A protein has these predicted regions:
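DPxDG-like acidic metal-binding loop motif
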Residues: 9-31
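C-terminal nucleotide
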Residues: 1-6, 26-30, 39-51, 57-199, ...
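A sequence/structural signal of beta-propeller blade repeats
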Residues: 34-35
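Conserved short hydrophobic patches within well-ordered secondary structure
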Residues: 16, 204-206
């Protein structure tokens, strides 16, 4: 998934793996649940050495807006070399995935900066800076948006995403390069909120807009800054 030789950083590896699994299971007449598809795709990616959270894989496998809490990836990766596939897939991985029916109406956007994400070395540097305080605060901010979506609390949703964005800035300046800062600033003065997505340092950012008029302004600002709109989806009460 690329344009002019530049790869889109929006979970394309996970997309390819999930779609390949679905194609094979369809060919052989097998019916896999969303959970089974997720676990099989995560298994494949872990075996390849992928170090991601697998959150993108969960979204793709469930084809829905979800709350996601990752499993112990290190433990499962170690078992891949020790146990058969059937045994690993049959285990309770400890993953938490819940479908969300939002009580808010909003546009969800993905903007592409056309710049590569930070390198694996920089990712490792960022990981080394992660503290217990950072983990505690981010966990709180993962729970708040779920509650806000279910309760229709727009301002709490916006505040929480802003807090996560601030935590990432404090964690490492490498996460928000200039293009991602522009992507985020484009939401200022609008009924919108934007932040980086994925590893950071480039690739993609996301935005939520709670006003159709502001959605148009946001996209125009992105376009003027050379940021491509890769994806748009409307969620909520009037979808």
């Amino acid at each position: 998934m690329e344009q002019d030789g530049k790869k889109f950083g929006l979970g394309s590896s996970g997309s390819v793996v999930v779609l390949t699994i679905r194609a094979i299971t369809a060919l052989y007449g097998l019916a896999l649940s969303a959970e089974e598809t997720f676990k099989l795709a995560a298994y494949v990616l872990l075996k390849r050495g992928d170090n991601g959270s697998m959150g993108d894989v969960a979204c793709i496998a469930y084809e829905d807006l979800i709350y996601y809490q990752s499993f112990d990836r290190k433990r499962i990766a170690e078992q891949i070399n020790e146990s058969p596939l059937e045994s690993i897939l049959a285990q309770d991985w400890g993953t938490v995935i819940r479908r969300i029916q939002p009580q808010l109406t909003f546009d969800f956007f993905v903007g592409w900066t056309k710049e590569p994400a930070i390198s694996r070395d920089l990712i490792n540097q960022v990981k080394s800076a992660i503290s217990s305080s950072f983990l505690t605060q981010t966990q709180e901010e993962v729970l708040r948006p779920e509650k806000a979506l279910l309760a229709g609390e727009k301002e709490i949703m916006k505040e929480s995403l802003e807090k996560v964005s601030h935590l990432l800035v404090e964690l490492s300046p490498a996460i928000y390069n200039e293009k991602l800062r522009v992507l985020k600033r484009a939401s200022q003065g609008l009924d919108c909120v934007a932040k980086s997505s994925g590893a950071g340092g480039g690739d993609c950012g996301i935005a939520l807009s709670f006003s159709e008029a502001d959605s148009q302004i946001l996209v125009e600002r992105w376009r003027g800054a050379g940021i491509d709109l890769l994806y748009k989806e409307r969620w909520g009460m009037d979808e």
